[in-house]
């Protein structure tokens, strides 16, 4: 799959995988990973997007999430990675 297809699928609640991005279910629900770092997840009817800055590519992935979420009228919230989903991002 292309990166944009994985991200669009994530926003629509589907799993998918490309070389750098994956959307997969874990114990807390559907999450989006960029290079194995959780950058977004579904919770309470909203997509929670990381506030952490990683690489230009990961920022591009996050911007795509915002773009697709706005098209679908899905609420966006943010999360601070050191405090949320700690076991999923290796901290």
Stretches found by the model and what they are:
Residues 1-91:
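Terminal leader/tail segments of proteins
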């Amino acid at each position: 799959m292309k990166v944009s297809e994985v991200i669009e699928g994530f926003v629509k609640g589907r799993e998918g995988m490309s070389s750098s991005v994956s959307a997969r279910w874990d114990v807390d629900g559907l999450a989006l990973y960029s290079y194995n770092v959780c950058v977004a997840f579904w919770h309470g009817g909203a997509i929670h997007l990381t506030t952490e800055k990683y690489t230009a590519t990961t920022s591009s992935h996050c911007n795509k999430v915002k773009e697709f979420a706005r098209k679908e009228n899905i609420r966006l919230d943010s999360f601070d990675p050191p405090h949320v989903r700690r076991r999923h991002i290796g901290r």
